[in-house]
Structures are given as structure tokens and as C-alpha cells.
Amino acid sequence: MKEANQWSSKLGFILAAAGSAIGLGAIWKFPYVAGTSGGGAFLLIFILFTVLIGLPLLLGEFIIGRRTQKDAVQSYKTLAPGTKWHWIGYLGMVTCFILLSFYSVVGGWILIYIIKGFTGGLSQTSGFDTIFASTISNPYLAVGGQLLFMVVTILVVAKGVSSGIEKASQVLMPALFLLFIILMVRSVTLDGAMEGIKFFLMPDLTAIDANTILYAMGQSFFLLSVGVSVMVTYSAYLEKQENLVQSAVSVTVMNMLVAVMAGIAIFPAVFSFGLKPDQGPVLLFNVLPTVFNQMPFGIIFLLAFLLLFLFAALTSAFSMLEILVAVLSKGDINKRKRFAWLGGIAIFIVGVPSALSYGVLSDVTIFHLSIFDAADYLVSNILMPLGALLISIFVPLKIPKQDLFDELKSGSNLKRKWFAVWLLLIRYLSPVAIIIVFLHVIGIF
């Protein structure tokens, strides 16, 4: 694969991998859950689980991809020939396909709001719940926004790894952090901002219970894009001498940093204007527009936030489409553009029902969930945990111990004792933790 596609620099890989992991959930859901689940105490538990569960799994995917330098399906075929383990790669493809089909819908909503912001459609100080409802229920806006988001994603992925995904990530990721810093400074300087900071960061041990711990455990690998073989695909484009441990730590730290920065940027502003903190689309499309349009030059800060969310959505979308393109093109750069468009169009078509699930298809439900929510539930609660579990079993079972050490040792000074710790974590702690979280989210306990 490396003859056709390769990262031009280690930094480019780290930014692209971090961009893949930094999705909308890290910005609009995680801070709220942290604030309502123990604040600083929850953050400490999350960081602990990320180091003990998420990071070992991320390294496992890096090893699979870099050792074989093949796509998500061929990697498993190479490491476990004559077996069915390569179905992990197909599972990752299907998961990313479904995920991007409804993720692109949210990306479309963001694009519509950005257009509304630049054309004066978000200049009022109230009534944003009505604007949001009319946006997502309008079939032309919902599907049109989704289509525009997918076209941007396809154009970037079609250009290749270094010329497309890497270059885009090198622009979008620094821009994302810069916007975060600007918005953090503005947010914490507002009157009453301290209440928001306390909500997010003040440790509250009374809020820590079994559910909180289980959620922190689940987020420790969900927020790193582990379990869908995206990181297998991205690491396949790495040179053999690159330091996998350093890269994995960098991606993990950047992801945790964004989650913390999001809380500091959002909640001081929300509390400053006496509004209730919320999560998900309500936060982005209702609460934040109300907040920023009540302050001087508020539309500028609102547009900055919308752009920030757009950048996070795009960098994740690139990786979801890339795993599909990599498998279908089999590393042939001449076929990349064709499969990027074919795959992207197929994802768009499958995602149209999700785009219409709050409008003309609002009466259609699957197990009492809208089409959009049903797809989200399938990916988040079933497919991703299953993929993460299979990878945690595959790595120590099918890759020889010495090969694992050689991959982690390459480009680093990793000691045997730390390798033994990592192997212990991915072999025992990771699968047990994933099973516990899975049983919890499906309601068994």
C-alpha cells in the first residue's frame, strides 16, 4: 500500500489520526456528561481509563496497520491467513459506512447554519429552537446540506492521503485549536463565567456512581475511534521507523485536550447568560446561538463555533470514507478517485432516510427510535463495542509476542517491562472492560 499512499510526515499522520478521533461527541456531549457526572472527578476517572483501555487498543490498531501496510481487510488476512479474522475489517467498513451516513446529516445541519449565519439568518436573540426545527424538518435543506458535506468529504479523500487528507488535516486541526483558544478566552472573561467552570471542573464525588464509572470506561475507547479499524487504515500509510508509542500518546493527549477545552469554551458562556447546560444538537443549534447573540460581536463568535464543529466533523468524516476507499481500491491510487465518489454517493443515498427522519419520515420508527437515532444506536452501542472487543482479542492472540514488541520498539526506546504492561492491559483489561460496558449499554445490568 505504501507505494501508492503514504503520509509525508509524522505530524501529518498525528493530526489526521487526532482529527479522526476528535468527533462531534467529544465537543458537544462529553463536556456535559463530565459536568453532570462529577466534574473534575469524572475527568480523572476518564483519563485513567483512557490510559489503561483506550491507549492500549489504539496501539493495537497501529501495530496491525503499520506491520502489514495493507487496508483494513487485507491486514487481518496477512496476519491470520486462512481464518475468518478479516471480517473485523469488513465490520469496520460497515460501521463507518453507517456512521458516516447519519454523521453527514449533522455535518449538513452545521453547513446550513453557517450559511444562515453569513446571510443574516441567525441575527436574532431568541427563537433558535424554531429555526433548528424548521431546518431539520425541511427536506431540501436537510438533504441539500448532507449532500454538500459529502461532496466536500469526497473531494478531499479522492485527492489521496498526503495530498488530500493530510493537507486538509494540517489546516483544519490547527484552525480548530486556534478557534478553541479564542473562544475559551472570550468565554472565561464573561460575567458569571466561574459558575460554568465549576460545573465542568469542580470535583463532585457524590455524583460518582456505577453508571458514571461505566460511562467513563466506554468513552475511553469510543472517543479514540477505536474498534472500527480506521486507525488500522491510517497507520498502514506510516513508515516502518515511525514511533508508534509516541504517535498514539500524541493522538490520545490531543483528544483529551479537545474534550477539556470544549467544556471550558462552552459552559462559562452558557452559565453567564443564565441558561441551562445541555448536550448534542440542542447545545450547538439552540443554546449557543442564544448565548452568543446576546453579547457584542456575538455572530462572529457563533460562526467561529460553527466552523470549529464543522472542522471536527470533516476530519472524522475523512477517515470514515478512507477505510472504504482503501479496501475497494486495494492501494491502487488510480482507482482512488472512482471509489471515493462511488463510496461517497452510496453513503449519501443510504443517509437520506436519516436526513428525512425529522421531516417527511418522522412517523417511521425502528424499535421506537427515529431512523437517525436507530442508526446511531446500532453504531454506538453494538457495532463499535463489538469491533473493539474483537481487536482486543485478535492482537495478543494472532500476532506473535516478539512481532508486537518489534513494532512498538521500532523508532522508540520502549523497555520490555512497559511492553509487558501494555500486553497485559490489551489481553485482559480491555476485553473485560468492553464486555462490561456493552452489557451495561444494552441494559443487561
Curated annotation (Swiss-Prot):
Family that this chain belongs to: Belongs to the sodium:neurotransmitter symporter (SNF) (TC 2.A.22) family.
Entry coiled-coil feature ranges: none
NCBIfam families to which the protein is assigned, alphabetical: Na_transp (NF037979)
Topology class, membrane: Multi-pass membrane protein
Protein name per UniProt: Uncharacterized sodium-dependent transporter YocR
PANTHER family the UniProt entry points to: TRANSPORTER
InterPro entries: Na/ntran_symport (IPR000175), SNS_sf (IPR037272), YocR/YhdH-like (IPR047218)
Functional note: Putative sodium-dependent transporter.
Database matches in CDD domains: SLC6sbd_Tyt1-Like
PROSITE patterns assigned: NA_NEUROTRAN_SYMP_1, NA_NEUROTRAN_SYMP_3
SUPFAM superfamilies on file: SNF-like
Subcellular location: Cell membrane
The organism's place on the tree of life at top rank: Bacteria
Gene Ontology CC annotations of this record: plasma membrane
Keyword line: Cell membrane, Membrane, Symport, Transmembrane, Transmembrane helix, Transport
GO molecular function, one term: symporter activity
Transmembrane segments: 11-31, 39-59, 95-115, 141-161, 165-185, 212-232, 251-271, 295-315, 341-361, 377-397, 419-439
